[in-house]
C-alpha cells in the first residue's frame, strides 16, 4: 500500500439506522504521505472505494478527492465523511467552501447544486423497477435512477451507476452529489434509500444551497 496503514482511516458514510449498509470511504489524514498526483491516484485505485480523500490541511479543511480513476472537484459522500472525521465546520475541496455541522446522529454539509456537473437523474415508475435494473444499465454517463416510495413523505428509492470506462465501481452504494442534484430538481426535502440500504437525508437551504446529511461510523 502506498500510504502507511496508520495514515489511513476507513469510515462508513450514509449508514442505515442500525449501522448497516454504507458507502465506505478511505481518508488519508496526512496528505504528505502521497505528495504527488500519481501516488494519490495509484492509492485510490488500489483501495477501490468509490472515493478516497487526502487531507492537505486539517485545520482549514483543504481536501483532495479521488475516485479509482480520476480527481473530483466536489463529491458529497466523502465530504460528509471527512467532516465527521475531522469534526470541523468548513471544508475546502477544489469546488469551493463547504459548511458542515453535526446534530448528534447525522453529519451535514451544505453545498451548491451547480457543482454537480457530471450526473443525470432518471425517474422510474416504481421502486421495484429501480431494484430490477442491471448493474450497470446499458448506456454511458453517470446515472442516478430513482422512484418514489412515498411521495407525500418525500421517501425515495435510488441507485447510482457511474458507467465510466476508467472506473472499477459498477454501482455506487450512496451518492451525495446525485442526491443534491435530485433535491434541487424536486425542490423539497428527501429521505433517500440508495443501494443495498444506505440512508441519505437532504433539504433545500437558503440562497439556492442544498443540505445533505447522513450517519457516519468507523469501519470494523
Regions found by a protein language model. Name each.
Residues 1-220:
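Active-site proximal loop and beta-alpha junction motif in alpha/beta enzyme cores
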Amino acid at each position: 500500500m502506498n500510504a502507511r496503514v496508520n495514515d489511513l482511516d476507513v469510515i462508513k458514510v450514509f449508514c442505515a439506522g442500525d449501522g448497516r449498509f454504507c458507502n465506505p470511504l478511505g481518508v488519508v489524514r496526512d496528505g504528505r504521505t502521497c505528495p504527488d498526483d500519481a501516488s494519490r491516484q495509484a492509492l485510490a485505485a488500489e483501495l477501490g472505494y468509490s472515493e478516497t480523500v487526502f487531507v492537505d490541511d486539517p485545520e482549514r479543511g483543504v481536501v483532495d478527492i479521488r475516485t479509482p480513476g480520476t480527481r473530483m472537484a466536489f463529491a458529497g459522500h466523502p465530504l460528509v465523511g471527512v467532516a465527521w472525521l475531522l469534526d470541523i465546520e468548513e471544508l475546502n475541496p477544489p469546488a469551493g467552501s463547504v459548511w458542515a455541522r453535526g446534530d448528534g446522529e447525522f453529519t451535514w454539509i451544505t453545498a451548491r447544486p451547480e457543482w454537480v456537473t457530471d450526473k443525470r437523474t432518471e425517474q422510474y415508475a416504481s421502486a421495484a423497477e429501480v431494484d430490477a435494473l442491471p448493474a450497470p444499465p446499458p448506456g454511458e454517463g453517470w446515472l442516478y435512477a430513482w422512484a418514489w416510495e412515498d411521495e407525500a413523505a418525500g421517501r425515495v428509492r435510488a441507485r447510482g451507476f457511474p458507467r465510466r470506462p476508467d472506473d472499477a465501481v459498477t454501482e455506487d452504494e450512496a451518492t451525495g452529489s446525485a442526491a443534491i442534484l435530485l433535491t434541487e430538481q424536486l425542490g423539497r426535502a428527501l429521505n433517500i434509500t440508495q443501494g443495498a440500504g444506505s440512508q441519505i437525508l437532504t433539504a433545500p437551504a437558503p440562497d439556492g444551497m442544498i443540505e445533505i446529511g447522513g450517519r457516519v461510523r468507523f469501519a470494523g
